């Protein structure tokens, strides 16, 4: 059986390296090529040699070539690169998975990609997406509780709050049956909560490998907490590969991890 060929955009990034290693260990998928910035010193080199894993794919700086040699493409980059990838996916009629965060709330994926399957999630961890469902259900049952979301990420994390924290907030808002609106409260009581339909955020940055999220339901007599801690970026790589393999068999459309999970 031929292996599914997976192209990786941002193959030498923090997440990209984990993706290369995860896919290279798969029995049903292989890395077709890895994309780096134009003019990079790594263009033409063997990806496995650079990263240190069993991967024979070459590194390229041509987005078009990457799509040409791939059955499906995965990207963890930045919003601008993500848009270019969506345009190329549409042109080449190839499915694409994106885990890029920091995108505008106003972005409409259908403006760029219409005729191929596309899956986006701010967090591709299977367990985090289970937590999102638990949060929505808990919020629905805990009417009258204040909702606060806390996160800590490595010092290099650019978006704040993280895409995952926003997903948690939106899950809570669905449970409240209200329009999502983000409120960030300043520590020390300088800003007061207006009602228990609002969602507070607290953000911390530090270290190099941290990724913790906690959602707190604070009532008058008790406090309930849900938390998720990613101890290794492989959890996102595993989710991304699972999503990519699933996406290949889907009709054109915009998908989330929730869509995939209901079919498992």
Swiss-Prot record:
Source species, domain of life: Bacteria
Binding site for (S)-2,3,4,5-tetrahydrodipicolinate: 154, 163-164
UniProt-annotated binding residues for NAD(+): 10-15, 99-101, 121-124
Any one Gene Ontology BP term: diaminopimelate biosynthetic process
Places the protein is found: Cytoplasm
GO cellular component terms attached to this protein's record: cytoplasm
Transmembrane regions: none
KW Iron (keyword) present: no
Record pathway: Amino-acid biosynthesis; L-lysine biosynthesis via DAP pathway; (S)-tetrahydrodipicolinate from L-aspartate: step 4/4
EC number: 1.17.1.8
Disulfide bond residue pairs: none
Residue numbers annotated as active site: 153 (proton donor/acceptor), 157 (proton donor)
Keywords from the named record: Amino-acid biosynthesis, Cytoplasm, Diaminopimelate biosynthesis, Lysine biosynthesis, NAD, NADP, Oxidoreductase
Binding annotation for NADP(+): 37
Annotated catalysed reactions: (S)-2,3,4,5-tetrahydrodipicolinate + NAD(+) + H2O = (2S,4S)-4-hydroxy-2,3,4,5-tetrahydrodipicolinate + NADH + H(+); (S)-2,3,4,5-tetrahydrodipicolinate + NADP(+) + H2O = (2S,4S)-4-hydroxy-2,3,4,5-tetrahydrodipicolinate + NADPH + H(+)
Any GO MF annotation of the entry: NAD binding
Main localization of the protein described in the UniProt heading: cytoplasm
Gene3D superfamilies named among the record's database cross-references: Dihydrodipicolinate Reductase, domain 2, NAD(P)-binding Rossmann-like Domain
Family to which this protein belongs: Belongs to the DapB family.
Stated role: Catalyzes the conversion of 4-hydroxy-tetrahydrodipicolinate (HTPA) to tetrahydrodipicolinate.
PANTHER family, per database record: 4-HYDROXY-TETRAHYDRODIPICOLINATE REDUCTASE 1, CHLOROPLASTIC-RELATED, DIHYDRODIPICOLINATE REDUCTASE
Name listed for the protein in its UniProt record: 4-hydroxy-tetrahydrodipicolinate reductase
Source species: Ehrlichia ruminantium (strain Gardel)
Lineage: Bacteria, Pseudomonadati, Pseudomonadota, Alphaproteobacteria, Rickettsiales
Gene: dapB
């Amino acid at each position: 059986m031929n292996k599914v060929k997976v192209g990786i955009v941002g193959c030498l990034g923090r997440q990209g390296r984990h993706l290369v290693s995860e896919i290279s260990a798969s029995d049903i998928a292989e890395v077709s090529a890895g994309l780096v910035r134009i003019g990079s010193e790594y263009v033409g080199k063997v990806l496995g040699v650079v990263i240190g894993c069993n991967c024979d794919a070459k590194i390229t700086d041509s987005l078009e070539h990457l799509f040409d040699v791939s059955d499906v493409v995965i990207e963890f980059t930045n919003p601008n690169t993500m848009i270019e990838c969506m345009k190329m996916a549409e042109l080449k009629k190839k499915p694409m998975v994106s885990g890029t965060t920091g995108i505008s709330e106003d972005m409409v994926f259908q403006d760029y990609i219409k005729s191929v399957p596309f899956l986006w999630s701010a967090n591709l961890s299977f367990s985090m997406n289970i937590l999102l469902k638990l949060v929505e259900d808990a919020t629905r049952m805990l009417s009258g509780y204040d909702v606060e979301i806390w996160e800590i990420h490595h010092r290099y994390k650019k978006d704040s709050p993280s895409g995952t924290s926003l997903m948690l907030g939106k899950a809570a808002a669905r449970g409240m049956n209200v329009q999502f609106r983000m409120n960030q409260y300043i520590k020390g009581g300088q800003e007061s909560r207006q009602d228990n339909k609002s969602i507070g955020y607290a953000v911390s940055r530090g270290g190099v490998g941290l990724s913790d999220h906690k959602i707190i339901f604070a009532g008058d007599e008790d406090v309930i907490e849900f938390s998720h801690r990613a101890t290794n970026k492989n959890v996102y790589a595993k989710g991304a590969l699972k999503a990519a393999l699933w996406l290949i068999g889907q009709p054109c459309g915009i998908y989330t991890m929730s869509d995939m999970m209901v079919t498992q």
